[in-house]
């Protein structure tokens, strides 16, 4: 029920890859980081009860074809059946794969700079990133993942295997997005962790509160489920 599938291609190039002397375990840190980033991104863009994961479908030299799956847990399926409503997964596998690759491409584009700014643009339904005289449009899913500490840090580790002698570059492809990073750009890529948000747009959300607890100073800690919560401050009108 509500299972979707996409393909991610990750390919490492360089003399050690070409001549077959590179051990696959030297590429494992980047591949595992990609899996971590996917897991964190899925928690941000999909509700509780929707899981995501990778599996290796083909491996040849430095090229890996990865199956990306998004599915509802058994408990979530039963809850949906009991409610009589099965809503579409907000971010299915294909879109999730595109968002993940888009985050990697954004980190490369920023070149390690910290003076860039995000602004929400309703006309494109996403965000515009400005760095000096350069501009880039990114999706809302990519913006959410990039801004998250855990997802952003995991994406930075995708470049880890480029520190291996004889590995010159890594390429990552989804159906609609592409990312390629040379070893010479690794340091700047890993520095791109945070940028400012500049936007006057007001975004309205309707949320279902799971539970709430009082904190000090008229603050309320509101839980929206296992992975999502926020702090609100009560004020007199």
Model-assigned labels for residue ranges:
Residues 1-126, 130-133, 137, 141:
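Protein-protein interaction interfaces in oligomeric scaffolds
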Residues 132-236:
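Long, positively charged binding patches that form subdomain-scale interaction surfaces
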